[in-house]
Amino acid sequence: MAKEKYDRSKPHVNIGTIGHVDHGKTTLTAAITTVLARRLPSSVNQPKDYASIDAAPEERERGITINTAHVEYETEKRHYAHIDAPGHADYVKNMITGAAQMDGAILVVASTDGPMPQTREHILLSRQVGVKHLIVFMNKVDLVDDEELLELVEMEIRDLLSEYDFPGDDLPVIQGSALKALEGDSKYEDIVMELMNTVDEYIPEPERDTDKPLLLPVEDVFSITGRGTVASGRIDRGIVKVNDEIEIVGIKEETQKAVVTGVEMFRKQLDEGLAGDNVGVLLRGVQRDEIERGQVIAKPGSINPHTKFKGEVYILTKEEGGRHTPFFNNYRPQFYFRTTDVTGSIELPAGTEMVMPGDNVTIDVELIHPIAVEQGTTFSIREGGRTVGSGMVTEIEA
C-alpha cells in the first residue's frame, strides 16, 4: 500500500490516558494504536507495543524529570497526539507543570477494582489544571461475569466524577478490554473503534492559539530615537497587528494602554505577528521607563494583574536538584512567571504542617507585586536562581 501524505487539514487534538496504576492505561494506548493501524492503515497509524510505550524516555521540563510516552495516530476525522506516563508521579508532574496540555483525556478504570485512590487524584488534577472533557473506559470487562457488578462500578465512577464537577451523569462510559483488543479479538477491536469515535465526537476541537486573545510576555525593551519604544518577546497566543490597541499588564498597580505602530521580526517590518513568533513591537505613547521585562502586552481586558491566587504545585526531590528539607507555612521563595521572578509567601492548607520534597500540594500565594495571571498560568518556584518547584494557577483570589 502506498504511503499517504501527512494530512495537515485534519484538526489536531491532544489527549492522554489517566487513571490508577495497573488499570490498563498503557495497554489501552497500545490497543488504540494497534487497532487503528489494522482498521485505518496510514503512514501515521503505526502499531506501538506495550514495551515501547512503557519505556518512555526521560524528559526535562522546567528542571523536572518526567517520563512520558508520546504516540500519534489518526481517525478519519482527526489527528491525535496521545500522552501516556508510566508512573503516578509522572502524571502529577505532567499535569501540574503543563508539560502535557490535554484537550481531553480517557480515564481508564479496571472493572475488577472500580475507582481507586489515584483514579480520584487524577480526576481532581484534571479539574484543577483545566482538562474539561473526560471519557471513561471501563477496562478488563472480560474478567467480570456479573453484569450487576459492572453497573455498580459504572455508577461509582459517575458519582466520583460528579463530585469533582464533571458531568458524571452525561459523560460517555465505554466498556471493553484493552488486552483482548490488542490480541486481535474483533468484538473488542470494535469497542476500541467505538471509543475513538466517541473521542472524535465528545472532545471538542481546541481553539487555535491564533484565535485566542493576544498575550506577549515582554523580554526586552529599548527605545529607537524618533520612533518610540520597542518591546520584544515571543507571542504566547493571539495575533498582534499594526494599529492595535493593547494593554501593558503586571508589576505596576495601573494597567497602561498603548497603540502598536510597528511589528518587526528578524529586522523586517510585518503587518502582523502570530502566536509563536519572536517579535519586536513598536509602541506609541509609552516611555522607555514605563514598560519592563515581566510585564505582558495583551488584548485590552483579557488579563488582569493579581497578587493572590491558589496554585497546585509539585515540589522537586533532592535528586531532581530541589530542596533537601521540607518547607513550612509562610515560606517565601521567588515565583518565576514567564520572564521574571517575583517574591511571594506561601500559605499551606489547613492541617498541612509542612511540604516534603517530592510532594504535590494546593497552596495560597501572595506576591509582593502584581503579575498578569489567570487560571492555567504556569510558574516555577525558585530559591536563589534554582528551581525547587513547579505549579499552575488554579484560582484567582485578588
Swiss-Prot record:
CDD domains noted in UniProt: EF_Tu (cd01884), EFTU_II (cd03697), EFTU_III (cd03707)
Domain tr-type G: 10-207
Database matches in Gene3D superfamilies: P-loop containing nucleotide triphosphate hydrolases, Translation factors
SUPFAM superfamilies linked to this entry: EF-Tu/eEF-1alpha/eIF2-gamma C-terminal domain, P-loop containing nucleoside triphosphate hydrolases, Translation proteins
GO process annotations (BP): translational elongation
Enzyme class: hydrolase
Region (G1): 19-26
Keyword Transferase: no
This enzyme's EC code(s): 3.6.5.3
Region: G2, residue numbers: 63-67
GO cellular component, one term: cytoplasm
Keywords attached to this entry: Cytoplasm, Elongation factor, GTP-binding, Hydrolase, Magnesium, Metal-binding, Nucleotide-binding, Protein biosynthesis
Region (G4): 139-142
Region of interest (G5), ranges: 177-179
Gene Ontology molecular functions: GTP binding; GTPase activity; translation elongation factor activity
List of residues binding GTP: 19-26, 84-88, 139-142
Subunit description: Monomer.
Stated role: GTP hydrolase that promotes the GTP-dependent binding of aminoacyl-tRNA to the A-site of ribosomes during protein biosynthesis.
Family the UniProt entry places it in: Belongs to the TRAFAC class translation factor GTPase superfamily. Classic translation factor GTPase family. EF-Tu/EF-1A subfamily.
Protein name, per record: Elongation factor Tu
Organism name: Streptococcus pneumoniae (strain ATCC BAA-255 / R6)
